């Protein structure tokens, strides 16, 4: 079913993007897509004071984390099993804005991002386009990060074998009140809604992953599908539930 959005119909680039992702013009739509400074951005028209949401792998917070974020000592790296001589092939089944996928790719993993919502997929594709063209990170980004648009459940069933790790970060109601999380989560939950079928992701993820499934959860959330993980890596506000199938080597 086509998604209604507002956009400048006089701007050929926007018209092309919306046609590609089957987004239909609606003068009364809550969300607007803009293309400014070679960047696609999403805006909530009900909250005009909020900045637009973009996917940016080249500058800002993700670039800072790539350079100064702790490398393979980060909790997410430990959770997916990154260690010397081991760089897993990962499917990120709930890509969102691609931040976790980018961290893993920057540490050497090959990552396929799966995103079902066409507006979010359009933002991801735009972010990848700019990253692929970047002199500093473009070469390895083209090698290690790709986008698959479709429902996670469908995608996990159809993706080729040879996947070491499936990473899941289902949408969950956030208690965090930080400005960034509030802004992005408000927009995301209005646009996408909660992942009501998230519990159904675990079984196909376990079937696809040859080594392990990693589920990122807020520290107050229950286990996905009520299944107890093999091990848990805790951070300040989140935890990584790890379901191990076989050893990393």
Curated annotation (Swiss-Prot):
GO terms for molecular function: 16S rRNA (guanine(1516)-N(2))-methyltransferase activity. S-adenosyl-L-methionine binds at residues 99-100, 115-116, 151-152, 169. Its EC number is 2.1.1.242. It is found in: Cytoplasm. One of its GO terms (cellular component) is cytoplasm. Belongs to the methyltransferase superfamily. RsmJ family. This is Ribosomal RNA small subunit methyltransferase J.
């Amino acid at each position: 079913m086509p998604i209604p959005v507002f956009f400048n119909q006089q701007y050929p680039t926007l018209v092309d993007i919306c046609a590609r992702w089957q987004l239909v013009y609606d003068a009364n739509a809550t969300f607007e897509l803009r293309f400014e400074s070679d960047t696609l951005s999403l805006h909530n028209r009900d909250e005009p004071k909020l900045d637009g949401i973009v996917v940016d792998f080249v500058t800002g917070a993700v670039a800072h984390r790539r350079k100064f974020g702790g490398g393979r000592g980060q909790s997410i790296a430990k959770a997916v099993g990154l260690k010397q001589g081991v760089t897993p092939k990962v499917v990120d089944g709930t890509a969102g804005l691609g931040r976790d996928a980018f961290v893993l790719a920057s540490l050497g993993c090959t990552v396929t991002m799966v995103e079902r919502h066409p507006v979010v997929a359009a933002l991801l594709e735009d972010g990848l386009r700019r990253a692929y063209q970047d002199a500093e990170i473009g070469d390895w980004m083209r090698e290690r990060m790709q986008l698959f648009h479709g429902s996670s459940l469908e995608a996990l069933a159809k993706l080729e074998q040879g996947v070491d790790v499936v990473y899941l970060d289902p949408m969950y109601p956030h208690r965090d009140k930080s400005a960034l999380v509030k802004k992005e989560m408000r927009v995301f939950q209005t646009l996408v809604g909660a992942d009501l079928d998230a519990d159904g992701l675990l079984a196909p993820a376990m079937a696809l992953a040859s080594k392990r499934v990693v589920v990122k959860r807020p520290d107050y959330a229950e286990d996905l599908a009520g299944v107890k993980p093999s091990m848990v890596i805790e951070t300040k506000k989140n935890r990584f539930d790890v379901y191990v199938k076989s050893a990393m080597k």
